[in-house]
Design a protein with these regions (language model features):
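C-terminal extensions of enzymes
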Residues: 161-197
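Single conserved hydrophobic/aromatic residue that forms the stacking wall/gate
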Residues: 1-12
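Ligand/substrate-recognition segments at binding pockets and active sites
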Residues: 25
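Conserved anion-binding
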Residues: 16-19
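Shared catalytic-loop signature of beta/alpha-barrel
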Residues: 37, 43-46, 52-172
Length: 197
């Protein structure tokens, strides 16, 4: 509602940060368009999955009727699903996750498809440290990389199970010189957390 969007705008102005709106596909096209008209004045960075990602026609309708980018793809798993989003111009930012799309090679193929259509890539970083490292490597190797999307600080358990890990500085990830993905699992530490399921 209008009161909430005003409050959100006030927080955004104080924080001096980008405003990324995610709905996890829980809206109708009409409600997403209506919400977008309310929040447009705050210059959102994107509206993520305004409708279910398997309904590319509905998502394209939203994309045509709002004045800031639609982002989608965190739940998509194949280049064919991404191709449908691309062809229908349903999103201008694709959020692939190397752990879901079949790995680095498939991720790079999707990124190339997006690049050929002037779309950006924002790898989805809601994952464990190995997939995060793969997302980072792909991000560093493509020309249409936008941001790494995530809310974790990559401290705590993720760092405990790794011997070598990537480092963050001023909001950016620093690639290291280590081979492969640039990370190394601490197998002794992992053994201290047995799965009994």
């Amino acid at each position: 509602d209008n009161t909430r969007s005003r409050g959100l705008g006030d927080v955004y102005k104080r924080q001096q940060c980008d405003l990324l709106i995610g709905t996890h596909g829980q809206m109708t096209p009409e409600s997403a368009i209506r919400l977008s008209s309310e929040i447009e004045k705050y210059d959102p960075f994107w509206l993520e999955e305004p409708v279910p990602p398997n309904n590319s026609d509905a998502m394209a309708k939203v994309a045509r009727h709002i004045n800031f980018p639609v982002a989608a793809g965190e739940r998509l798993t194949t280049k064919y699903e991404f191709n449908e989003i691309i062809n229908k111009q349903a999103a201008s930012i694709l959020q692939l996750n190397m752990g879901r799309v079949g790995g680095i090679l498939e991720g790079k193929k999707i990124a190339s498809m997006a690049e050929a259509n002037h779309l950006s890539i924002a790898p989805h970083m809601y994952c464990g440290p190995i997939v995060a490292a793969a997302n980072i490597q792909v991000a560093a190797s493509i020309s249409n990389f936008l941001i790494l999307e995530g809310i974790k600080d990559w401290k705590g358990f993720d760092c405990k199970i790794m011997k070598k890990y990537f480092k963050w500085e001023a909001g950016s990830v620093l690639l290291n010189e280590a081979p492969g993905l640039g990370v190394e699992i601490d197998e002794d530490m992992i053994e201290s957390f047995p799965y009994d399921g």
